[in-house]
């Protein structure tokens, strides 16, 4: 039995996923994570460094790594790539001025070898705000349709209400689960 097959069998038993949550500062990463965990969202501070939370969802154990998005912290993102099964890229859909910067940062991430094959969930957050950019336009600016190295999907959502968050996480778990936990 090959080493990879042994690792897959071990992970299949554990049904554990490592999910990295990234995006520019003020995109709503921490609020989304807290809402998903059913934690209070009334006092959110910018994440300086990272925060790890574990939750059971859809028969999986999800290890959620929420990493700060400030410009000064982005060079440290690479320290969190190892063993990542999925990347959640959070976009502030109301911030037109930084959408191009958001696209550039995502392209850098997708070129990282240690993220190769990781499922990509793009959450267009703050979709409830006036003037928010629709998901098709965001997908176009992020050039998502050209991505061949990762399974991906984009959802509009609202971190404060939790709108479409469960649906998005269900897609992510189904996608990662179909890659990692099917044994031959």
UniProtKB/Swiss-Prot annotation:
Gene3D superfamilies: P-loop containing nucleotide triphosphate hydrolases. It is found in: Cytoplasm; Cell membrane; Cytoplasm, Cytoskeleton, Microtubule organizing center, Centrosome. SMART domains: ARF, RAB, SAR. Keywords: Cell cycle, Cell division, Cell membrane, Cytoplasm, Cytoskeleton, Developmental protein, GTP-binding, Lipoprotein, Membrane, Myristate, Nucleotide-binding. Its main location: cytoplasm. In the embryo, strongly expressed in migrating hypodermal cells. Shortly before the beginning of elongation, expressed in many developing neurons where it persists throughout adulthood. In the larva, highly expressed in migrating hypodermal cells and the uterus. Also expressed in vulva, spermatheca, sheath cells, distal tips cells and proctoderm of the male tail. One of its GO terms (molecular function) is GTP binding. The keyword Nucleotide-binding applies. A lipid is attached at residue 2 (N-myristoyl glycine). One of its GO terms (cellular component) is aster. It holds the Pfam family Arf. GTP binds at residues 23-30, 66-70, 125-128. Disruption phenotype: Worms exhibit abnormal vulva, gonad and male tail development and disruption in embryonic proliferation. Subcellular defects include a lack of microtubule cytoskeleton and excessive chromosomes in oocyte nuclei. Many embryos show a lethal phenotype arrested at the bean stage just prior to the beginning of morphogenesis. One of its GO terms (biological process) is protein folding. GTP-binding protein that functions in embryogenesis, cytokinesis, germline development and microtubulule cytoskeleton dynamics. PANTHER family: ADP-RIBOSYLATION FACTOR-LIKE PROTEIN 2-RELATED (PTHR45697). Belongs to the small GTPase superfamily. Arf family. This is ADP-ribosylation factor-like protein 2.
């Amino acid at each position: 039995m090959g080493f990879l097959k042994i690792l897959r069998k071990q992970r299949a038993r554990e049904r554990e996923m490592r999910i990295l949550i990234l995006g520019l500062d003020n995109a709503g990463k921490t609020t989304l994570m807290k809402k998903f965990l059913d934690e209070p969202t009334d006092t959110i501070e910018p994440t300086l460094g990272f925060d790890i939370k574990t939750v059971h969802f859809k028969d999986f154990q999800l290890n959620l790594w929420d990493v700060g998005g400030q410009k000064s912290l982005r060079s440290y993102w690479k320290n969190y790539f190892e063993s990542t099964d999925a990347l959640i890229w959070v976009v502030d859909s109301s911030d037109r001025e930084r959408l191009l910067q958001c696209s550039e940062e995502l392209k850098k991430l997708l070129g990282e070898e240690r993220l190769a094959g990781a499922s990509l969930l793009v959450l267009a957050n703050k979709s409830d705000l006036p003037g928010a950019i629709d998901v098709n336009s965001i997908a176009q600016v992020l050039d998502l349709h050209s991505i061949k190295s990762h399974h991906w999907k984009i959802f509009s959502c609202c971190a404060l209400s939790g709108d479409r968050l469960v649906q998005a996480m269900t897609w992510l778990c189904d996608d990662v689960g179909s890659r990692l936990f099917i044994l031959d």
